[in-house]
Design a protein with these regions (language model features):
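Ser/Thr/Gly/Pro-rich low-complexity, disordered linker/stalk segments of secreted
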Residues: 43-81
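Glycoside hydrolase catalytic-domain groove-lining segments
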Residues: 1-3, 7, 128-145, 251-296
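Surface-exposed cleft-lining segments at the edges of enzyme active sites
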Residues: 145-156, 183-194, 223-226, 248-265, ...
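Long, well-ordered alpha-helical scaffolding segments within enzyme catalytic domains
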Residues: 1, 164, 169-170, 194-209, ...
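N-terminal carbohydrate-binding/catalytic regions of secreted carbohydrate-active enzymes
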Residues: 1-2, 8-33, 87-175, 301-305, ...
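Aromatic- and acid-rich polysaccharide-binding/catalytic face
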Residues: 8-10, 112, 116-117, 233-263, ...
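Aromatic-lined carbohydrate-recognition surfaces of secreted/lumenal glycan-active proteins
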Residues: 4-10, 85-86, 97, 205-231, ...
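Active-site groove signature of glycoside hydrolases
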Residues: 5, 165-195, 216-225, 246, ...
């Protein structure tokens, strides 16, 4: 039996150093802190960040460390106290919105933790506006749509764009969430097959690893309709080592699509919540989009629905660590401002300490 391990932490014929990337170093520290190796006291954790790699990093992403840096949001990539390195709050959940507006945020009486934005493959982002939002302490959730072909990404023909974007986000510095081609269930066939998506996702992550873009947190963002897609989710999933967060987009479709009944927050979130508990139990969950319209007489109101969502987050949906409301007039009127009661309820839950995480 092996009774001792001595790592060759040096640069010789190859660069074997554990600190070739932030992810590598965090993984090595987690290994060293495992009780199996705890035979002598460990030295204090260094206070400085590791140097960015000068050679390609490993193609896997270790599970984020539970010991965060102490930098506040907007100050260069660290995690504040009370958060893991993957920006998972140790308690409570992050609160966010799409279609950001400062006037509307002022109505809420607090800053949003997350602002959700959407970009195409060749876009240059974060934009100046997005950088300003991040500089004020908000986290960006960026949906990055592929060029229309997952095989083209997976086979390396899009590596130049991946490297360009990875270097830009590395230079940005702050922690951010990046979802590669969200809701891929909608594009199976046109963009490729489920296995192509998983390979493309891994190719993107590997490209970011190569340049040392350690501030980027990768989000696997599904629609979350288990009834129609549950059989393909295992093939779409790129693997735990490539995913920091799992996100899905549940909606209460009553009044927007024919044949849909009124459904509670617990009901719309349950199927995919249960699926992830069985297939990826260690990953934090995010509602990257969710919404409802005003509800019919005799049903719980939109305001009551919001208030109940906070109850569920505290009790039955404790693995959901971030929720981002789809505050848009899109295929339905999902806007919070559909009634004064809706605004008041949404404002009240946002001010609750459970959701008041970053600010």
């Amino acid at each position: 039996n092996v009774q001792a391990l001595v790592y060759f932490d040096a640069k010789k014929a190859c660069d074997y150093r554990a600190a070739t990337s932030g992810r590598s170093l965090e993984g090595f520290k987690r290994l060293a802190r495992d009780p199996h190796f705890q035979t002598t006291p460990l030295p204090p954790t260094p206070s400085t960040r590791p140097t960015s790699p000068t050679s390609p990093t490993a193609s896997t992403r270790p599970t984020p460390s539970s010991t965060p840096p102490t930098s506040p949001p907007g100050s260069g990539g660290g995690s504040p106290a009370g958060f893991t390195a993957a920006m998972t709050p140790n308690s409570g959940a992050l609160w966010g919105t799409s279609k950001f507006d400062k006037g509307w945020e002022a109505q809420m009486g607090r800053k949003f933790d997350i602002v959700h934005v959407y970009h195409q493959w060749s876009h240059s982002f974060p934009t100046a506006t997005e950088r300003a939002l991040a500089a004020e302490g908000r986290l960006l959730l960026i949906n990055w749509k592929s060029p229309g072909s997952w095989p083209a990404v997976a086979n390396g023909s899009q590596d130049a764009q991946i490297t360009t974007t990875a270097n830009r986000l590395k230079a940005f510095g702050d922690k951010l969430f990046l979802a590669f081609h969200h809701e891929p269930e909608n594009d199976i066939g046109a963009a490729g097959q489920p296995a192509d998506y998983a390979r493309a996702f891994r190719r993107v992550v590997d490209g970011f690893n190569r340049v040392g873009a350690d501030n980027v947190l990768f989000v696997w963002n599904m629609m979350g309709f288990v009834g129609g897609h549950g059989d393909i989710y295992p093939t779409l999933y790129p693997g735990d080592q490539y995913v920091d967060w799992i996100a899905y987009d549940p909606y209460n479709w009553y009044g927007c699509k024919a044949g849909h009944k009124v459904r509670s927050f617990a009901q719309i979130t349950k199927p995919f919540y249960d699926w992830t508990a069985a297939h990826a139990p260690g990953k934090p969950l995010m509602l990257a989009e969710y919404g409802l319209r005003e509800q019919p007489a005799g049903s719980p109101s939109k305001a009551a629905w919001f208030r109940d969502s906070l109850v569920q987050l505290r009790t039955t949906r404790t693995r959901i660590k971030a929720l981002v409301y789809f505050n848009n007039l899109h295929n339905c009127d999902w806007r919070i401002t559909s009634s004064s009661a809706s605004v008041a309820a949404y404002r009240d839950i946002g001010r609750d300490p459970f959701l008041n995480r970053l600010h």
